From Swiss-Prot:
Assembly notes: Component of the ER-mitochondria encounter structure (ERMES) or MDM complex, composed of MMM1, MDM10, MDM12 and MDM34. Associates with the mitochondrial outer membrane sorting assembly machinery SAM(core) complex.
Region (Disordered): 160-195
GO annotation, cellular component aspect: ERMES complex; SAM complex
Pfam families, alphabetized: MDM10
Record's keyword annotation contains Membrane: yes
Membrane topology listed for this record: Multi-pass membrane protein
Protein name (database record): Mitochondrial distribution and morphology protein 10
Endpoints of the signal sequence: none
Native species: Cryptococcus neoformans var. neoformans serotype D (strain JEC21 / ATCC MYA-565)
Entry comment, domain topic: Lacks alpha-helical transmembrane segments, suggesting that it resides in the membrane via beta-sheet conformations similar to those predicted for other outer membrane proteins and porin.
Protein localization: Mitochondrion outer membrane
Family statement drawn from the similarity comment of this UniProt entry: Belongs to the MDM10 family.
Native organism taxonomy: Eukaryota, Fungi, Dikarya, Basidiomycota, Agaricomycotina
Domain of life: Eukaryota
Keywords: Membrane, Mitochondrion, Mitochondrion outer membrane, Transmembrane, Transmembrane beta strand
């Protein structure tokens, strides 16, 4: 379960049109959701409130093994109207899950607002602050978009003069592929009272660069990611097909081979240098992601490949090589595996994990065999009803034409029905533009249908090479989001259970 602050930050990126996945630090995000999911370490309770679309508050309480808490405040320049109660929020958006992200797009500038001959739209920004109790640590994050393709981040951590043994990390610091999570950091001789982390991101869709600087250890870093075969600002596949049909086929043009995985490649790397610790690091990575097929599919089209992501990471300094494969094998099951090896010492590690969406769909809850469900007011929209009728009509006509069983009476009846719809305010549509028109006319209906179709629970499991087994269950129970996890050591006979945790989140 992701935190409320991370949930707000992702919605803010979506509102301003910023590519959330087009970063080198997010190269292994798909496989990490199945193999590196975090378990609740204790009993955690989090309450979040949204008094206005641009201001949010959050309160967290950690009861075990000692009582800790925090208070958070977030404000944004862009109203986030989609964030509401825990029951109205899509469950798939508040958890880390298997996901194939769409191709990145070039960020567009903010809409111009003029008043008295001057532009007054302002600049996009997000401000976040969190106070940790009783240690009185203060952490925060400030992000703003300087240009349509340039964004700046400033994360800070302030602590009292006598720091405790456990110190929180700066919020939303991107992970590094050159350091392993199990490696302990080098203890500083005299801890500083705080730290400031500065990041500058330049995203053009095809290319993304990230420049970072940490004040505490004087570390300067550079991360880059390049997308091959990027078509963010070019014509779509449908437009290309129509243009080819108009122009005709060239003499030297060959037939396209069907089948296989159709996707896009992304390659990147990172370099960092610490002046105080006199350390240097480098890593490179490669990712292949399948591209969803263009709808509607032709009748003779091959079966589309399942959503798949393959990643390869290599650190030449320590000789660490890691490869991961993740795929969605069914609509409710996704699997992933990762193999890492050190080419210098030949030490290796294998991890296997997956997720299984369980529970009944929200739209089917409360239904009985004796009574039909009551239709929602938005589902009785006449425009959407006409869309469904036109879709059924198109499918029926295509089926009859293929079977050559259309009678003269049926043809006359269908012609009369089509003539009536020409004078109807509801236009005749195909499957290509039916979804677009439905979103334009009734934008609130699609989120409601997604909420009714989604499942309210997911079960995750992973098994690592050292025979540690982790199990996590995340679900929506009424208006609360619940996460329960257990970590077990299959080789330990005296104490096989390492940790058990429970986390409850409530959005209002």
């Amino acid at each position: 379960m992701i935190g409320f602050s991370a949930f707000i930050l992702r919605n803010y990126y979506a509102a301003i049109g910023w590519n959330e996945d087009n970063l080198y630090s997010s190269l292994t995000r798909t496989s990490s959701a199945l193999l590196d999911f975090q378990l609740p370490q204790s009993l955690i309770l989090q309450l979040a409130n949204s008094p206005t679309p641009i201001f949010f508050t959050s309160y967290a309480l950690d009861a075990l093994p000692q009582l800790n808490g925090s208070i958070s405040y977030i404000t944004t320049s862009m109203p986030l109207d989609e964030i509401g109660s825990g029951r109205a929020t899509a469950f798939k958006n508040v958890i880390e899950r298997f996901r194939v992200f769409p191709p990145p797009k070039r960020p567009q500038p903010k809409d111009e607002v003029w008043l008295g001959g001057k532009r007054i739209e302002g600049r996009d920004y997000l401000l976040y602050s969190r106070l940790h109790l009783p240690s009185l640590h203060l952490s925060g994050l400030a992000t703003t978009r300087l240009t349509p393709t340039l964004q700046a981040h400033l994360a800070f951590l302030s602590q009292p003069a006598h720091p405790t043994s456990t110190r929180p990390t700066p919020p939303q610091t991107p992970p590094s592929h050159t350091r392993q999570p199990s490696e302990p950091s080098t203890p500083a001789p005299s801890p500083t009272p705080g730290n400031v982390f500065i990041s500058l991101q330049h995203d053009t869709g095809r290319y993304c660069g990230e420049y970072t600087y940490s004040v505490q250890d004087g570390m300067v870093g550079l991360r880059t990611l390049y997308n091959f075969g990027w078509h963010g600002d070019e014509e779509s596949e449908v437009d290309k097909k129509e243009r080819r049909e108009r122009e005709g086929k060239r003499i030297d043009e060959e037939e396209m081979m069907e089948g296989g995985l159709k996707g896009r490649f992304s390659a990147g790397g990172e370099v960092y240098f610490s002046a105080k610790q006199r350390s240097f690091g480098i890593s490179t990575g490669l990712r292949f992601t399948t591209v969803p097929p263009t709808l509607p599919l032709p009748l003779n089209a091959p079966v589309p490949s399942p959503p798949t992501t393959l990643t390869l990471l290599y650190n030449p300094l320590i000789g660490f090589l890691s490869s991961a494969y993740s795929a969605q094998v069914s609509p409710t099951v996704a699997l992933a595996t990762r193999f890492g090896v050190n080419v210098y010492s030949y030490e290796s590690d294998l991890s296997v994990g997956g997720e299984w969406w369980i529970g009944r769909r929200r739209g089917k809850r409360g239904l009985t065999t004796d009574a039909e469900p009551q239709l929602d007011a938005e589902s009785r929209d006449p425009v959407v009803t006409g869309i469904e009728e036109n879709r059924e009509l198109t499918e029926k006509m295509a089926q009859r034409a293929s079977l050559r069983q259309v009678t003269l009476r049926d043809e006359i009846g269908e012609d009369v029905h089509a003539e009536k719809e020409l004078y109807s305010p509801i236009p005749v549509m195909t499957d290509v533009n039916a979804g677009e028109l439905a979103q334009q006319i009734s934008p609130r209906l699609q989120p409601q249908q997604d909420l009714d179709d989604e499942r309210d629970g997911v079960l995750k499991a992973r098994l690592s090479g050292n025979w540690q087994f982790a199990l996590l269950y995340e679900a929506r129970i009424r208006n609360c989001l619940v996460s329960a996890g257990v970590l077990a050591d299959l080789t330990g006979r005296q104490h096989p259970i390492r940790s058990i945790g429970l986390e409850v989140q409530y959005f209002s």
